[in-house]
Amino acid sequence: MTRSVYVTGIDRGDGRQVVELGVMELLTRQVDRVGVFRPLVHDGPDRLFELLRARYRLAQDPATVYGMDYHEASALQAEQGTDELMSTLVDRFHLVARDYDVVLVLGTDFADTQFPDELALNARLANEFGAAVIPVVGGRGQTAESVRAETRNAYRAYEGLGCDVLAMVVNRVAREDREELAARLDSLLAVPCYVLPDEPALSAPTVAQITHALGGKVLLGDDSGLARDALDFVFGGAMLPNFLNALTPGCLVVTPGDRADLVVGALAAHSAGTPPIAGVLLTLDERPSDEVLTLAARLAPGTPVVSVAGTSFPTAAELFSLEGKLNAATPRKAETALGLFERYVDTGDLLKRVSAPSSDRLTPMMFEHKLLEQARSDKRRVVLPEGTETRVLHAAEVLLRRGVCDLTLLGPVDQIRKKAADLGIDLGGSQLIDPVTSQLRDSFAEKYAQLRAHKGVSVELAYDVVADVNYFGTLMVQEGLADGMVSGSVHSTAATIRPAFEIIKTKPDTKIVSSVFFMCLADKVLVYGDCAVNPDPNAEQLCDIAVQSAATARQFGVEPRIAMLSYSTGTSGSGADVDKVREATELVRLRRDDLKIEGPIQYDAAVEPSVAATKLPGSDVAGQASVLIFPDLNTGNNTYKAVQRSAGAIAVGPVMQGLRKPVNDLSRGALVQDIVNTVAITAIQAQSPHEKATAQ
């Protein structure tokens, strides 16, 4: 039977979309096929479903998502009664349920007066669907005692109507009340109650939303700038010195278009990072001169300047009526919402309570979710030497918002801050270090000179070397100030990896450093090694690569079944190349008799059960290999790229293995998600019994 989860509420303004998004994230980690159903819907686009469809790559036909609109439902109820309405909605729900393992049901929004008792309506729908219920209570603007009473009453109401209440969620609670309220509710209710604090970034409208609502014209700014949250509104009418003192981080400056001094002053303050602003909104439909706009564009590239026709007072009223929304056009809000949900909800316990069927398949999305979850479970510090690179900054924002790991970014601190401000990126909670001016430079120079004394490196030379961001980052890892390092988006592989070879070096039981790719196919993840480092490993080195790759696979939840690849299977071939693979296979068996391994074996026999049944019947590995070891770099690199292109696989990596501490190299074409994944992998590699890094 399909399991379903019904997220509902008791009134408007509860910020329930945070919970709906969080539950969807949770379900897609565990289950491949997740459907969505909204029993009643208003006319117009469903922005939350569009977000879910884009973020989770849902193939579900949008026409099946909705039961019916409110007007249709009201008419049906009036003409044929409530039972007929329920029967129709249940039939439409089951059209979705039959095709999915789990269905997330999005309850009504309490915005329609045609159904005066929407709580009872949601409760009955949940019961008819056989769905477990997660009621959400809004706490904004209420005392802790009021929220406690409302939550208790909501629980009793849904339970009294026969619902299977999975957990309660209280959202938008004042931060100072959250901890005490959570403790009191935990002792009051028979089910878990998760209390989420109010998060200003979620309720703040974006500059794009404001522009659309007010019918504004964009004079300056790019898409990234328009996506910034307007966390505050500062109205400019004072003289410049007083106006500058009033600026707050993330504020939208609202001023008449003829106040060129305030426009330039606000953007100059943004450029200096004191403080970074969301943008400038010009009233009275007055456009500054071209000279002022040119100066503004140079002061703060990408920062939006928008013109509207209204005067300041009507504009202010409209601004204060706007509230931020989660939708496909606000990915930053989605990351913030998920970070909030994952920080305050025991997702492991909630998933157990859902009792969602575990899938035998492991899709690319499920693998990526598991990476973030595993990294978050034991947070580590990762240093990113390329702190001024745009993609790295965007990835850092995602990692920080989701609470995946702690971050240190290297580079000129003023440049990092300015670049982040220009991109509208919040790096709060990260550590910024300039290797050139850092107090660590002297001690790092001495350390590096000691390590490279046999190469004749003096302290003076070392002082210059450690100013390089990759050497500095590697020394942070070596000295326990970071747990791992990720670089390479603008540096060569050699520039990224060479410092690790010189400083961190290999594990005691490892002869070489190698790499693997996680190849995320449609329904499983395979581990390919080595496709990036060793050109032509000998039998002993190939054995080392196989053992390392098996350990890496297991660390990331892939049960290792090793296929030592060659152009022939079993004893059918001969020659130096196949003999090398045969010898390496035997060495693995001698070294680790607990590992399942087969070799030499051809690729098709390794992964296709039908071929394996003919060529190697009875093998524990053939037809179901999960770790594929290539005989040389030429074969491995070409194969992973061929599979990536022809099979549409997502390649995550390369993941370096064999170093005493994790350092990973990015492709110079890496996308933001690639960087996020690689940082998460690095953090997971650092999760060991050793002490965590200590930030300086």
Swiss-Prot record:
Top EC category: transferase
Gene Ontology molecular-function annotations: phosphate acetyltransferase activity
Name of encoding gene: pta
Cellular component terms per the entry's GO annotation: cytoplasm
Family classification: In the N-terminal section; belongs to the CobB/CobQ family.
Protein name listed in UniProt: Phosphate acetyltransferase
Organism this protein belongs to: Streptomyces avermitilis (strain ATCC 31267 / DSM 46492 / JCM 5070 / NBRC 14893 / NCIMB 12804 / NRRL 8165 / MA-4680)
Keywords: Acyltransferase, Cytoplasm, Transferase
Enzyme Commission designation: 2.3.1.8
NCBIfam families with a match to the protein in the record: PRK05632.1, PRK09653.1, pta
Segments passing through the bilayer: none
